[in-house]
């Protein structure tokens, strides 16, 4: 009985500390999130009654979610709740799994991406993706950045040079790498590799950037740099980011969707989610009571 009481006190202490830490982040970001009203922003993605199955496993259930342009939208939730599956559905990469079946609609710029004649190639050009582990190609930094443009038919050396500089500047890493463009990207640190992957994504000028836990494999300094970069990128791109880090979601996002057991349990302004959630399960998750 004594051990049980000790554990309960430890859990309560941990919960209070987690909530206090997140509240501090939310409070410090209050001005940042005081932006134009949602009514002035266009919907870039509208998910309507989406269900998804892996074979007989019902992984996503009745997802309804409108994602606004030039926002950072955080997708949070415990492992196995459908976060990564959802964002991989947004560019149809999930269909690389043979057993996948979907029902419902996802409208990207008012067009249903599941329509028979909708081009997956065009979708993946417009919607870039950055993965959990940095995954540069085993090529030079220059060749990593120019891979996409060359695939799209750009051959002019001067234009490619301009794309490389613009993309690396966009990823806030040009000054670090401008004298190393022809060295292998594998020789970079993890944080540098991830920013090169972001630059590679920017090189094809996407409209939306999907990020699947982009800092989980990085050290704290590299994580901070990527978070600062995300804040800069949202001026020109719409960013949807999966994260397990509650403080990170509170720091960088404008909207937050909490997924639980394949459902969207709650979706609202990030400040609202972390300071005054409407649902008890949301409150329990962000305060560390489960997950």
UniProtKB/Swiss-Prot annotation:
Ranges annotated as biased composition (Basic and acidic residues): 1-17, 30-40
Region called Disordered, residue ranges: 1-40
EC id: 7.3.2.1
Primary localisation category: membrane
Transmembrane segments: none
Subcellular location: Cell membrane
InterPro entries in the cross-refs: AAA+_ATPase, ABC_transporter-like_ATP-bd, ABC_transporter-like_CS, P-loop_NTPase, PstB-like
Biased composition (Polar residues): 18-29
Assembly information from the UniProt record: The complex is composed of two ATP-binding proteins (PstB), two transmembrane proteins (PstC and PstA) and a solute-binding protein (PstS).
Similarity-based family: Belongs to the ABC transporter superfamily. Phosphate importer (TC 3.A.1.7) family.
NCBIfam families in the record: 3a0107s01c2
Name of this chain's protein: Phosphate import ATP-binding protein PstB
Record gene name: pstB
């Amino acid at each position: 009985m004594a051990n049980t009481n000790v554990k309960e006190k430890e859990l309560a202490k941990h919960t209070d500390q987690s909530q206090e830490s997140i509240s501090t982040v939310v409070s410090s970001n209050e001005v940042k999130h005081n932006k134009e009203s949602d009514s002035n922003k266009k919907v870039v993605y509208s998910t309507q009654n989406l269900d998804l199955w892996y074979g007989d496993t019902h992984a996503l259930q009745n997802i309804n979610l409108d994602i606004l342009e030039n926002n950072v939208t955080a997708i949070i939730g415990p492992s196995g709740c459908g976060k990564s599956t959802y964002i991989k559905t947004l560019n149809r990469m999930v269909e690389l799994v043979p057993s996948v079946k979907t029902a419902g609609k996802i409208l990207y710029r008012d067009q249903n991406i599941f329509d028979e004649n909708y081009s997956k190639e065009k979708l993946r050009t417009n919607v870039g993706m950055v993965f959990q582990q940095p995954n540069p190609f085993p090529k030079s930094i220059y060749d990593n950045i120019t891979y996409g443009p060359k695939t799209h038919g750009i051959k002019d050396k001067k234009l490619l040079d301009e794309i490389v500089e613009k993309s690396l500047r966009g990823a806030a890493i040009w000054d670090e790498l401008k004298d190393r463009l022809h060295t292998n990207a594998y020789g970079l640190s993890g944080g540098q590799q991830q920013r090169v992957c972001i630059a590679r994504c920017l090189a094809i000028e996407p409209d939306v950037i999907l990020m699947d836990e982009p800092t989980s494999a990085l050290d704290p300094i590299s994580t901070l740099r990527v978070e600062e970069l995300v804040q800069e990128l949202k001026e020109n791109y719409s960013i949807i980011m999966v994260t397990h880090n509650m403080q990170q979601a509170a720091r960088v996002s404008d909207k937050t969707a909490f997924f639980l057991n394949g459902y969207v349990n709650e979706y609202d302004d990030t400040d609202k989610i972390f300071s005054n959630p409407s649902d008890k399960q949301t409150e329990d998750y962000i305060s560390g009571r489960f997950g």
